Amino acid sequence: MHSPPKPEDVRELTPTDVNELEGFDGIMFGVSARYGGIPAQMKTIMDANGGLWQNGKLVGKTAGVFQSTGTMQGGQESVAMNCMSFFAHQGMVFISLGYIDPKAFSYEEIHGGSPWGSGTYAGSDG
């Protein structure tokens, strides 16, 4: 869908980087949908947080989600809800955007997003 490349100063989190999460006040997770659920890469990062969980290092930190799906009804809300279990187990505080933009109630054009988080449609080719 002709999206621009990722800016150089935006880092991608890998399972070996998860201990860095401890140093942040809040974390926004950008998650794509795979058949209505979170992709394996995101699940791997979540599963790598055992040490942080065991020591309560993410307790009280704020968390949010923005998501991308290939199509309408592609799982934007279910992706956000799938992240809730991780946030709850870590003791994180989920911050929702709610319906802050009046465009959420407009049906004149196709757009993503929900009270669970900001969203977009990437098309079937990602």
Where are these regions (language model features)?
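Short, surface-exposed, charge-dense and proline/glycine-enriched linear segments
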Residues: V18-D25, A88-I95, S124-G126
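Short, glycine-/small-residue-rich phosphate/pyrophosphate-handling segment
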Residues: V59-G112
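Short amphipathic alpha-helical segments at helix-loop
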Residues: G30, S68, S124-G126
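Residue-identity detector for threonine
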Residues: T14-T16, T44, T62, T69-T71, ...
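N-terminal beta1-alpha1-beta2 submodule of the flavodoxin-like/Rossmannoid cofactor-binding fold
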Residues: M1-K57
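Glycine-rich phosphate/pyrophosphate-binding loop and the adjoining helix
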Residues: D9-L13, G98-G126
